[in-house]
Amino acid sequence: MTARALWLLCLIVGWSPEAPVAERKAPPPHRKPDSRETPGPRAQPLPEFSRRPRAAYAGPRAWPDPRRRKTAPPADNRAGFRDAVHAPAALPGPRLAQAENRASPPEDSPRRALSRAVRPPGARAASPAHPNRPRAAAQPSGTPQALSPEDREPETQSCARACSADADEWEAYCASEFAVNGIVHDVDVLGAGMRLVTLLVDPDGLYKMSRLYITPDGFFFRVHILALDSSSCHKPCPEFKPGSRYIVMGHIYHKRRQLPSALLQVLRGRLRPGDGLIRGSSSYVKRFNRKREWQVRGATHTQCI
């Protein structure tokens, strides 16, 4: 009974408002570790900027008047303005000690001074020939000099006049043994002034055949013609361009027609009896056009004298 009463008494005293409340130890506030506790670089304190009083921001900001803004003076192109803008270069400083190790100036170099010496016009130092460069062969004194353009012009005009002479189709038709119209298929150069021409002729292009030897080749006929040029012109006469169409009138080669023995050795059986033969400007070789074809066809219906 005594223990129970003592326990109730203690309980009443503990819940009484007059009883002093036990002071509880509050935890220490959270703080950053000190520099002594954490190693490392120390944080620099931020500078404190002076703040303006709030009265300065009370009113609205006044924008400057553009009309009162001063305009920049126009740039002057005079020499005085450029001299004022560009400051003169500063005077060179004292020469350093390391400059003594530099190369000597160009005036002190004897090699450059020798190269700058005045040379007479046209004089050139003879340099040794390059070992891999072929030397130009010296022209003998007896060889003729090349013709100048003024001397070569009359010869060129005479060659062009002889090749482009307009021959009469009726006279050429009567003086020739064959007349064909064909496309140049191949031109074989046998030597100087010798060409073997192969023409592809359609049936309508055989104006005059006589004993001309032709070889069928599909829709066309192959005709071989030996063109001889005895002129000294740089351009062959007559001229045959592969792929072009020509009207050709000339003679027919046969065994009774004599040819130089040197020419026969070059041909070596490539020219057969019955092939065509034309000699320079004496034969008719012209580019095909409708007017010339009409005149040649008109000559086929006339009687030659």
From Swiss-Prot:
Keywords: Disulfide bond, Signal. Residues 1-22 form the signal peptide. Residues 18-160 are annotated as: Disordered. Disulfide bonds join C159-C233, C163-C237, C174-C304. SUPFAM superfamilies: TIMP-like. Belongs to the UPF0450 family. This is UPF0450 protein C17orf58 homolog. The lineage of its organism: Eukaryota, Metazoa, Chordata, Craniata, Vertebrata.
